Amino acid sequence: ATLREIETRLKSIKNIEKITNTMKVVASTRMGRAQRAMASSRAFREGDSDFFATAETSTPETAEKTLIIAVSSDKGLCGSIHSQIAKATRAKLQETPNADVVTIGDKIKAQMLRTHSSNVVLSFNGVGKEAPTFWEASLIADEIRKLGDYDKIEVMYNKFVSGVAFEPSVFPSFSPISIEESPKLSEFELEEDQAIPTSLSQISLTNAILNAMAEGYASEISARRNAMDNASKNAGEMINKYSILYNRTRQAVITNELVDIITGASSLD
């Protein structure tokens, strides 16, 4: 490579390093907000879990209609986080090949349409730019309810484990019938209203979606920060490598020019 080619390559890598460093800083500043949203959403979902555990709510052993809600986002540059949830969703479809799928996020939508387009019945995008809100989750839950009743609903999402780890996970969202047939629902002092199971199911679904989106958002921000950190380190190593190559090539050019000058001067003598 010529000296100019090496110099151009070196400038390009330095620009990439600036971009990845900036993205890492942005991800780091968003991490605190993401963790607060995740902690808040966990409190809602854990409240639901305690309620249904006490009521001994369960899904039917043989479900005629199953819905899988796969939660991801629209943004990339965050490692394998989207492909992992797509892989887990496909594994679920191996168990229930006739299940309907709702995708939340363009990334999971694109991956599922490539392999299971006939299963995808509804998709949402515009998610993952900011920490999710209850209002967003409620709007999504309302649209999902318009699909009709399902015997079994499972929410697939990336669970935040630590700053360097996440894992594809799943939790159920119960149908009105499952709630109504809970063996110990009578232990709660609920009003005699036929709409209560439906209301509880809707709130539970909203909380499940909110928590899945919040966990996924925190996992994604963490994964992006780590990916940009690794990219910055790799760029730094390449900068050192090309700097050494540039200096050696430059020294060789100078040496050759000196040899030419000395040779020319000698021939004049």
Curated annotation (Swiss-Prot):
Location(s) in or outside the cell: Mitochondrion inner membrane
Its membrane topology: Peripheral membrane protein
GO MF term set: proton-transporting ATP synthase activity, rotational mechanism
Subunit comment: F-type ATP synthases have 2 components, the catalytic core F(1) and the membrane-embedded component F(0), linked together by a central stalk and a peripheral stalk. The central stalk, also called rotor shaft, is often seen as part of F(1). The peripheral stalk is seen as part of F(0). F(0) contains the membrane channel next to the rotor. F-type ATP synthases form dimers but each monomer functions independently in ATP generation.
Role this protein plays: Mitochondrial membrane ATP synthase (F(1)F(0) ATP synthase or Complex V) produces ATP from ADP in the presence of a proton gradient across the membrane which is generated by electron transport complexes of the respiratory chain. F-type ATP synthases consist of two structural domains, F(1) - containing the extramembraneous catalytic core, and F(0) - containing the membrane proton channel, linked together by a central stalk and a peripheral stalk.
Family: Belongs to the ATPase gamma chain family.
Protein name: ATP synthase subunit gamma, mitochondrial
Organism: Pichia angusta
Gene this protein is translated from: ATP3
